[in-house]
Amino acid sequence: MKILRKNHPLFKIINHSFIDLPTPSNISSWWNFGSLLGMCLMIQILTGLFLAMHYTSDTTTAFSSVAHICRDVNYGWLIRYLHANGASMFFICLFIHVGRGIYYGSYVLSETWNIGIILFFTTMATAFVGYVLPWGQMSFWGATVITNLLSAIPYIGSMLVEWIWGGFSVDKATLTRFFAFHFILPFIITAFVLVHLLFLHETGSNNPSGLNSNSDKIPFHPYYTIKDLLGILFLLMALMILALFFPDILGDPDNYTPANPLNTPAHIKPEWYFLFAYAILRSIPNKLGGVLALLLSILILMAFPLLNTSKQHGLIFRPITQIIYWILIANLLVLTWIGGQPVEYPFTMIGQIASITYFTIILILMPVSNTIENNIIKL
């Protein structure tokens, strides 16, 4: 078996990626979230496949088909709620994974980091088109509002919106193509994940100390396979508790009302994992400015390798930047809260302050604190 594992063309790839992979001996539980994201992706593809067998992407029957899945299909309610709450677990793991990357300076592995940001964008796109599919009130109006943002692009904006809609409003053509996108995008994500891992294994993993760990590496199996299995066990437990006891806690009650183009919901808002970006979008009065700020709120992550001037790897021995980092996390939580609030005083003002703070921390405060800490080391 050992010979086969090391010599067989297919098994050799798996062996070098998951069995004999040299891994730093001191990586903590924060490094578990990569494997948890892989698990989430598998859960989403499998549950999504079974849902697609019963779903119809037609405006007249989409809402009814989701109700049919929940009522008449064997364990359809479970598959549907695992898929809906699985998306929330996916984004929780994604945010922690990115947060860990920033804290421990993983962005210095720039190829892996940039592919990761492309993955982030693709996952957000998948979640957005997926939210439209049940064809409830929030699905319809969310699709209308977000796709309408493209009309802010000069000259080609309105033409682009109609091209995406497949008509003059969000209708049957839009739903059909969104279903097609939602089906294909997870497989594109899977391809990007392989590229992400390819680049990661070129350089090797980062570790909490931020020091070179070539002198102290251990094989991935059995040490980290067992550790990852424990993480997966906790993830599945959390997901099952969410899906079985609180299936609708993260959803919107408006989505249990069939889509009606003649009746606008009081507060149009996306799923909770988009609220921070939605708050940044709303905090700018100008439409084009808001769209640019929305894009930059994620694209700014690509600036981390460029803005990094620190002589140390990660924040573990850098107390000033540590404080700034935790302020950034708190600021993102404030933005998430504001994104779910109505557009009125004082929420608009808090949103504007939090949006300015978000960009200021990343573009100004972090590079400045890097320089200060470099000078302290010289002393």
UniProtKB/Swiss-Prot annotation:
Cofactor(s) essential for the protein: heme b
Self-association state and partner proteins as the record states: The cytochrome bc1 complex contains 11 subunits: 3 respiratory subunits (MT-CYB, CYC1 and UQCRFS1), 2 core proteins (UQCRC1 and UQCRC2) and 6 low-molecular weight proteins (UQCRH/QCR6, UQCRB/QCR7, UQCRQ/QCR8, UQCR10/QCR9, UQCR11/QCR10 and a cleavage product of UQCRFS1). This cytochrome bc1 complex then forms a dimer.
Note: Heme 1 (or BL or b562) is low-potential and absorbs at about 562 nm, and heme 2 (or BH or b566) is high-potential and absorbs at about 566 nm.
Residues binding heme b b566, per UniProt: H97, H196
Residues annotated to bind heme b b562: H83, H182
Primary role: Component of the ubiquinol-cytochrome c reductase complex (complex III or cytochrome b-c1 complex) that is part of the mitochondrial respiratory chain. The b-c1 complex mediates electron transfer from ubiquinol to cytochrome c. Contributes to the generation of a proton gradient across the mitochondrial membrane that is then used for ATP synthesis.
Gene3D superfamilies attached to this UniProt entry: Cytochrome Bc1 Complex, Chain C (1.20.810.10)
Family: Belongs to the cytochrome b family.
GO biological process terms, semicolon-separated: mitochondrial electron transport, ubiquinol to cytochrome c
A matching Pfam family: Cytochrome_B
GO MF annotation: an example: metal ion binding
Location(s) in or outside the cell: Mitochondrion inner membrane
TM ranges: 33-53, 77-98, 113-133, 178-198, 226-246, 288-308, 320-340, 347-367
Cofactor: how bound: Binds 2 heme b groups non-covalently.
PROSITE patterns noted in UniProt: CYTB_CTER, CYTB_NTER
One of the record's GO cellular component terms: mitochondrial inner membrane
Keywords per UniProt: Electron transport, Heme, Iron, Membrane, Metal-binding, Mitochondrion, Mitochondrion inner membrane, Respiratory chain, Transmembrane, Transmembrane helix, Transport, Ubiquinone
Entry keyword annotation includes Signal: no
Binding residues annotated for a ubiquinone, in chain numbering: H201
Bilayer disposition of the protein: Multi-pass membrane protein
Protein name per the record: Cytochrome b
